[in-house]
């Protein structure tokens, strides 16, 4: 059962679902809009060996970041020109990890799904690849996997980037996501790189 706007207000007001910060203007008919945070991760790898720790750089923006397609040529001169012309803090190509401003806590009988905004789809930018599912009992910020597929796209801190759709489960989970010892991303409060290498250290699922 998907929660409606009325349900979302009721769940937040009763503190069954935590969304911090919460903005009533971001409540849709059956969703809640979330906004882009200021922290990002860019991988520094030619090959992703998922058995190893992936080398990456973390950075913050004051205002905006330009995300370019992977095959978009960038050098120091082009990056400098882009920054000056478009007044952006950073210019990157390829995939970029980001995070929401919103910290979310779900009870054991509510799960959620993240979807990117259709307006971004119309400029061929995705803000998640496969990690749109949020298990019941999750606590943390939502990781964004950002890729531009056509032209460079400028994203701005605090702008709406996607929406959460909440669903009520038939029965509560015995053990919520954040209470499972093997949960890799429980309680994340900033952008986190992939911890997939831990799959080879345990037989349990994330």
UniProtKB/Swiss-Prot annotation:
Entry-linked InterPro entries: dCTP_deaminase, dUTPase-like_sf, dUTPase_trimeric
Annotated catalytic residues: 145
Q: Which GO terms describe its biological process?
A: dUMP biosynthetic process; dUTP biosynthetic process
UniProt keyword annotations, A-Z = Hydrolase, Nucleotide metabolism, Nucleotide-binding
EC number, UniProt record: 3.5.4.30
Q: Where is this site: Important for bifunctional activity?
A: 132-133
Keyword check for Nucleotide-binding: yes
Give the catalysed reaction(s), semicolon-separated: dCTP + 2 H2O = dUMP + NH4(+) + diphosphate
Molecular function per GO = dCTP deaminase (dUMP-forming) activity; dCTP deaminase activity; nucleotide binding
Binding-site list for dCTP: 117-122, 135, 143-145, 163, 177, 184, 188
Its pathway is: Pyrimidine metabolism; dUMP biosynthesis; dUMP from dCTP: step 1/1
The top EC class, named as a word, is hydrolase
Annotated HAMAP family: dCTP_deaminase
Subunit structure and binding partners: Homotrimer.
- Which family does the record claim for this protein? Belongs to the dCTP deaminase family.
Its biological purpose: Bifunctional enzyme that catalyzes both the deamination of dCTP to dUTP and the hydrolysis of dUTP to dUMP without releasing the toxic dUTP intermediate.
Report the protein name in the record. Answer: dCTP deaminase, dUMP-forming
């Amino acid at each position: 059962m998907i929660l409606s706007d009325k349900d979302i207000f009721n769940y937040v007001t009763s503190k069954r679902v935590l969304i911090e910060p919460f903005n009533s203007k971001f409540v849709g008919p059956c969703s809640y809009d979330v906004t882009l945070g200021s922290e990002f991760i860019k991988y520094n790898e030619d090959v992703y060996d998922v058995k190893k720790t992936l080398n990456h750089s973390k950075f913050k923006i004051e205002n905006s970041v330009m995300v370019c397609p992977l095959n978009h040529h960038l050098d120091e001169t082009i990056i400098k020109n882009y920054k000056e012309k478009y007044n952006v803090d950073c210019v990157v190509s390829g995939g970029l990890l980001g995070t929401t401003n919103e910290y979310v806590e779900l009870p054991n009988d509510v799960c959620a799904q993240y979807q990117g905004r259709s307006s971004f789809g119309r400029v061929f930018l995705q803000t998640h690849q496969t990690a749109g599912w949020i298990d019941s009992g999750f606590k943390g910020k939502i990781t964004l996997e950002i890729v531009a597929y056509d032209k460079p796209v400028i994203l701005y801190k605090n702008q709406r980037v996607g929406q959460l759709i909440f669903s009520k489960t038939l029965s509560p989970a015995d053990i919520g996501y954040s209470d499972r010892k093997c949960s890799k991303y429980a309680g994340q409060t900033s952008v986190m790189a992939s911890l997939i290498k831990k799959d080879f250290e345990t037989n349990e699922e994330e």
